[in-house]
Design a protein with these regions (language model features):
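Asp-based, Mg2+/Mn2+-dependent phosphohydrolase catalytic module
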Residues: 1-6, 99, 108-222
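Short glycine- and Lys/Arg-enriched binding-loop motifs that mark or flank ligand-binding interfaces
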Residues: 11, 44, 102, 131, ...
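Short linear interaction motif-like sites in intrinsically disordered regions of transcription factors
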Residues: 29-32, 101, 194
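Residue-level marker of regulatory loop/turn positions in helix-turn-helix DNA-binding domains and
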Residues: 84, 103, 134
Length: 222
């Protein structure tokens, strides 16, 4: 078990709160087939990245800006319910209001739709692809989330599942817990890892005039 202290927690969305990995990969398969492109380069880099950066990396010969304007994610589920990652509903219920945010590489429309379909609350601070000029692995989404929560970046803990997101959190000066839904622990280089949010628990919640709110987070290597 590892113990962390932080003022706020910032979650990635896909693969961390919502079990949407299958839909993300299906979208890229459909798009690659429609362009006559091999899918493997896209699957290697799509997790944790915006569509813009994914296309730039996997198909550098294309005009990524023009392509992403026509890239409209559509889940194969057709609006049906999505599963939350195990432990996500319980963990979010135990966190104080205003102590957590979501920072995702998806658009706001996709993010809010997936949260609703998974039965999860939409946080007061939700940072999405269109909110930043640079997507992950640049730290912009996490820095913006910290600002929205009113805490300094070094007092935030990030929960991620993808190398690009972990690199972004590191660049923002934040600690990182990895959920191994899309990558193996050795691929991630996080401060701690767990197979699902069932392994993450809120311990003590303290409040004082000097530091403000302080959360204790316990992470079990499940």
């Amino acid at each position: 078990m590892k113990r962390f202290e932080c003022s706020a927690i910032v979650f990635d969305l896909d693969g961390v709160l919502v079990d949407s990995t299958e839909y993300v990969e299906q979208q890229w398969r459909r798009w690659a087939v429609s362009k006559g492109l091999p899918i493997e380069p896209f699957l290697r880099v799509c997790h944790g990245r915006r569509a813009l950066e994914t296309i730039r990396l996997a198909a550098p010969h294309l005009n990524a800006e023009a392509e992403v304007a026509a890239f409209v994610p559509e889940d194969e589920a057709g609006g049906q319910a999505l599963r939350p990652v195990e432990g996500a509903p319980r963990l979010l219920e135990t966190l104080p209001v205003g102590s957590w945010a979501v920072a995702t590489s998806g658009t706001r429309a996709v993010a809010t739709d997936r949260l609703r379909r998974a039965g999860l609350p939409i946080p007061g601070v939700l940072v999405c692809a269109e909110d930043v000029l640079r997507g992950k692995p640049s730290p912009d989404v996490y820095l913006l989330a910290a600002a929205g929560l009113g805490v300094v970046p070094t007092e935030c803990l990030v929960v991620e599942d993808a190398p690009a997101g972990i690199e972004a959190a590191r660049a923002a000066g934040m600690g990182v817990v990895a959920v191994t839904t899309t990558h193996r622990p050795e691929e991630l280089g996080a401060d701690a890892w767990t197979t699902s949010l069932a392994g993450v628990h809120v311990g003590r919640i303290a409040q004082n005039a000097r530091q403000g709110r302080m959360l204790e987070l316990l992470v079990l290597d499940l």
